[in-house]
Amino acid sequence: MNGAQLASKVRNMMKAAQFSRFGGPEVLEIVNLPDPHPGPGQIRIAVHAAGINATEWKLRKGELNFGAGLPQTTGRDVAGVVDEVGEGVTDVAVGDRVFGVSDDGAGAAELALLTFRAPIPPSLGFVDAAALPVALETATRSLDELSVGRGISLLINGTAGGIGSTAVQLAVARGAPVIGTASTANHDYLRLLGAEPVTYGEGMAERVRTLAPDGVDAALDVAGSGVLPELIDLAGGPKNVVTLADFDGAKQHEVRFSSGYQGHAFHALNEIGALIEAGLFWLPVERTYPLDEISEAHRVSEHGHVRGRLVLVIDTRIVKPERGPRG
């Protein structure tokens, strides 16, 4: 019996973050929960790092409701080491380094179950890998819905965060010219990613037209800042606009709201390695936190202007990776 298999047998409780009522970051607590075990097609990983996403603090506040009751666990983006596999799993083995999306939204924990996963690219450590899954899937899905490809000019509203930063680089890799909105402080960062920056806020549309007098072919709204009418005008109609953040505005202006219910793009997890190894993709991690500081991580994610991602580092010694870097 190897060490990973032994670890999975002797443990029966894990540390995990959860909330028992809706509210601010203070409702989060670290509790002991029974170890999960994978079903058919699933794997279990010892979580080394877990990303923080806006969806998680919106669920915590009660702004989103996916039908789960209370208490709720939290966390979707995870990276770690496989320590148990379910029936029918042949693509990974115990000891492999993987990243992906927690099946039950319980990634901020010592153990997590995954169906959608991929090997961590060789040059990435766990922290950088944990920043990627949701941003990759969401950005890829949105670009696919807009048919972004070579020569298709794209405007992204809200570009400096994790999804926006990811969408810029994926669009540029497809050969699309990109204009991105962000604060002036982030303009150099957007140029580094490959986008032409414009400042958001009043007069944004006029500033975009100085770069694209005839408008753009497509527009992606990541920020949900009430600019859908301007994006529709710049992109030549609502059919050329997708929003990730303005559900009510999408209904009002007949714009597509992309939520993932229409289909996922988890194939992006397996495809990103080539761009990373070629030096064509990079998603910065602005800050890391230990699991017991998840409340502060949520506070910064909710109220701060984060460039890239925030990531929890899980102090796990359940298994050690058999291959690849250990960062």
Give residue ranges: language-model regions.
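NAD(P)H dinucleotide-binding glycine-rich loop of Rossmann-like/cofactor-binding domains
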Residues: 100-158
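Residue-level marker of beta-strand positions
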Residues: 96-97, 111, 153, 173, ...
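Glycine-rich beta-strand-centered segment in the early N-terminal region that forms part
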Residues: 34-51, 63-105
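Glycine/proline-rich active-site loop of Rossmann-fold NAD(P)-dependent oxidoreductases
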Residues: 303-308
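Short amphipathic alpha-helix with an adjacent loop that forms part of the alpha/beta core around
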Residues: 204-214
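Glycine-rich phosphate-binding loop and adjacent beta-alpha segment
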Residues: 191, 222-284, 291, 313-327
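Mid-domain Rossmann-like dinucleotide-binding core that forms the NAD(H)/NADP(H) cofactor-binding site
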Residues: 132-201
